């Protein structure tokens, strides 16, 4: 998305009331919405710097407004706007964070829950993904192989097996070791 011109949503809701499904902003989003609608799998990938998805991804998500219509729906006490067309895509969310602990992904998890992701990959201790440390590299390589298997299973089966889901959450390093690795 960084290479696409995507203006910020103005909140004018012309895409709902004046010209349903059409945004007044003229940028690359029209083509991206077309690709989004034609895709079998939608992937949202973002690092966590502070609490949630980056502004780049949030801007894209905000610009999905033309895919909604101004009719409220309720499901299990949660309210949202009705989709113009039923979602048939599977959603995949991938994120990493430099801090240890899974709590760093709570806001993102809540933000994407509405799209009911088929696969969520959250990697804490993200600084290890670029390390040259031989001890950490071995564990990172092992984890990356699991990520590849998860992707393959997602493409072929439409979901991932329980053993892959569990392996995606493998600890790369203890919090104490990671703090020492960071020099903290």
Regions found by a protein language model. Give the residues of each.
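Short, glycine-/small-residue-rich phosphate/pyrophosphate-handling segment
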Residues: 56, 70-119
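N-terminal beta1-alpha1-beta2 submodule of the flavodoxin-like/Rossmannoid cofactor-binding fold
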Residues: 1-69, 137-184
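A generic secondary-structure micro-motif detector
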Residues: 22, 102, 123-124
């Amino acid at each position: 998305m960084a290479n696409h011109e995507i203006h910020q949503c103005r909140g004018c809701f012309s895409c709902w009331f004046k010209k349903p499904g059409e945004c007044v902003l003229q940028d690359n989003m029209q083509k991206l919405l077309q690709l989004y609608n034609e895709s079998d799998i939608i992937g949202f990938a973002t690092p966590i710097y502070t609490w949630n998805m980056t502004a780049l991804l949030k801007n894209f998500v905000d610009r999905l407004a033309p895919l909604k219509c101004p009719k409220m729906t309720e499901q299990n006490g949660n309210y949202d706007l009705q989709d113009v067309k039923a979602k048939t895509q599977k959603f995949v969310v991938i994120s990493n964070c430099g801090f240890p602990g899974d709590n760093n992904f709570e806001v993102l998890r809540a933000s994407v829950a509405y799209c009911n992701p088929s696969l969520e990959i959250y990697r804490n201790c993200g600084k290890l993904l670029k390390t040259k440390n031989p001890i950490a590299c071995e564990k990172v390589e092992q984890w990356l192989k699991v990520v590849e298997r998860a992707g393959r299973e997602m493409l072929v089966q439409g979901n991932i097996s329980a053993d892959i889901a569990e392996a995606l959450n493998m600890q790369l390093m203890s919090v104490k070791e990671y703090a020492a690795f960071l020099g903290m």
